[in-house]
Regions:
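Beta-lactam-recognizing serine transpeptidase/beta-lactamase-like catalytic domain environment
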Residues: 68, 190-203, 241-289, 294-522, ...
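Periplasmic/cell-envelope proteins involved in peptidoglycan metabolism and beta-lactam response
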Residues: 1-267, 357-369, 520-553
Length: 553
């Protein structure tokens, strides 16, 4: 090797040695001497991981009126490590966040916390005030809160949502999977002032919820609520009033109302959470003489009696040595008159002819003892004695609606089947679910089963018309229209406590509307179904029929 080559090799060696030494020095400087400066620079930026709430679907009545919707609001967040003066920030913010100042200060002064939620669905006025404060480290995400434009109307049907926007009661709960939508997610870089830097690193847009269209007609709902509100003041019932209006041919619920009720915009403002439940589907009661409609239909369909067959009603009937008393002595009457004038004595004789097996077959066929499957949450199945445990006296009292417990929705559904041609219809309160302009699920009228023949149904309709024109239901007559119905009065759990009820329909020749009214333990101005519940049903039928013949036509 020449001296020139050796010299050149040595120079290259020295050059690479110097370069490697320089890199080592730089690495030591980065890791040690300047580490605090770099840490400060890194600390001046952070990421914000935000869940993007979808818009909840609206709920509409059958005419397109909005029953539940969203109004602008905001979610408020904090990045405590970016808040320079937690005490001052707490003082300025707490009044807009429904939080006490001390609790807010604990959150804002916790520098170990990356991210904190201060408020969900904060009203828009408060959001605007929070934005105007311009506090570094406080973020606002525009969102929505639930609103019920009609206030208390349909409160137990609609239910309400929680602070997180999820449904808690009513249709808001049972149809939450359609209404809620799918949340999105945004991950963004934020600076030391808590402001977003550049475009989001990741963005998954939320998918908004579906809209629900109900069978409820808010006009008929309004008539129904007005009628029971007047009655509530007049009769002062201890346990409230329930009213249901149904299209008997389709099973569509046109109105469903209960008192007492609540405002779903402020659901916490109630004496008890019981106000949130829906007695129309979740409470049970002895139906009393309204149940005679069921017994009579079963007897006529089974051909154990004819409408004109004559009976003698002495005011009592003896079963297994026990004297079962009727409410009055009616003497010589036909079976039709026994329905019109509500003879317990005759119905005990009729159910003896039917027998346990046949009677229970019809009880089951009419849907008693089973949930109807309506879209509302909290429905119960009622109480029917086991057939194997029933005694003759039990059978006798069940014939006129005692010793059996039903729900209001069961009763109006069964009653509708008696007067609609004999078909038990599945009751439903949802007409369809839509996403944009596309219907994704439709709830069509559904025949569960045919319970009685059209001939029996026709016979029952005209017997029930006479109950209103000549019998116990006279207070339900509507001038200009034919009305049929049946009254009921049941002594409740304690002496002197009664459930006054009435089930009615109109017009008799072509029923468009069926209505059931329960007044539970009225304390003044009467207690019998004919004097308390029938006038309420009359007002609902009158207003609804006029509405159908004018506006709807």
């Amino acid at each position: 090797m020449t001296s020139y080559v050796k010299k050149r090799t040595f120079i290259i060696f020295i050059f690479f040695t110097i370069m490697i030494f320089a890199l080592i020095v730089r690495l030591i400087w980065i890791q040690g001497i300047n580490s605090s400066k770099l840490a400060m620079a890194v600390e001046r930026q952070s990421t914000a991981d935000i869940i993007l709430k979808p818009q909840r679907g609206n709920i509409y009545d059958v005419n397109g009126n909005i029953l539940a919707c969203n109004v602008p609001a905001g979610d408020v967040f904090a990045a405590p490590k970016f808040i320079k003066n937690p005490e001052k920030a707490s003082e300025e913010l707490y009044k807009y966040l429904n939080m006490d100042k001390d609790s807010l200060y604990k959150i804002l002064s916790n520098k170990n916390s990356e991210w904190a939620v201060l408020g969900r669905s904060v009203p828009l006025d408060n959001i605007n005030k929070i934005k105007s404060l311009n506090i570094p480290g406080i973020y606002v995400e525009n969102t929505f809160t639930r609103s019920y434009p009609y206030g208390k109307m349909l409160s137990q049907v609609l239910g309400f949502t929680g602070i997180d926007g999820n449904g808690l009661y009513g249709l808001e709960y049972s149809l939450d999977r359609y209404l809620s939508g799918i949340p999105g997610r945004e991950i963004s870089l934020v600076d030391a002032e808590g402001r977003k830097v550049g475009l989001p690193d990741k963005l998954h847009k939320p998918v908004n919820g579906d809209n629900i269209v109900l069978t409820i007609d808010s006009v008929i709902q309004g008539y129904t609520e007005k009628a029971i509100e007047k009655a509530y003041e007049k009769y002062k019932p201890e346990d409230g009033i329930t009213a249901i209006v149904m299209n008997p041919k389709t099973g569509e619920i046109l109105a469903m109302a209960n008192l007492p009720d609540f405002d779903p915009n402020n659901p916490q403002d109630v004496p008890s959470q019981e106000y949130w439940s829906n007695p129309a589907i979740s409470s049970i009661y002895e139906p009393g003489s309204v149940f005679k409609v069921i017994t009579a239909s079963a007897a006529l369909e089974s051909a154990v009696v004819t409408p004109d067959e004559r009976f003698y009603d002495p005011g009592y009937y003896v079963v297994s040595g026990r004297k079962i008393r009727s409410w009055t002595v009616l003497g010589d009457i036909t079976f039709s008159q026994a329905i019109e004038k509500s003879s317990d004595t005759v119905f005990v004789q009729i159910v003896e002819r039917l027998g346990v097996d046949a009677f229970y077959k019809y009880i089951k066929a009419f849907g008693f003892g089973s949930r109807t499957g309506i879209e509302l949450p909290g429905e119960v199945s009622g109480m029917v004695l086991s057939k194997s445990k029933i005694y003759p006296v039990d059978l006798a009292t069940m014939s006129f609606g005692q010793g059996i417990a039903v729900t209001p929705i069961q009763m109006i559904t069964a009653f509708s089947s008696v007067i609609n041609g004999g078909n038990l219809m599945a009751p439903h309160i949802v007409k369809y679910i839509e996403n944009g302009d596309k219907i994704i699920k439709e709830y069509k009228p559904q025949i569960v089963r045919q319970v009685i023949s059209k001939e029996t149904s026709d016979t029952m309709r005209y017997i029930l018309e006479k109950t209103v024109t000549e019998g116990t239901g006279r207070a339900a007559q509507v001038p200009g229209y034919t009305v049929g119905g049946k009254t009921g009065t049941t002594e409740n759990y304690a002496p002197g406590k009664y459930v006054a009820s009435f089930a009615g329909f109109a017009p008799v020749e072509n029923p468009k509307i069926a209505v059931l009214v329960l007044v539970k333990n009225p304390t003044q101005n009467g207690y019998m179904g004919g004097e308390v519940a029938a006038p309420i049903a009359q007002e609902i039928l009158r207003d609804a029929l006029r509405y159908y013949d004018t506006v709807k036509k």
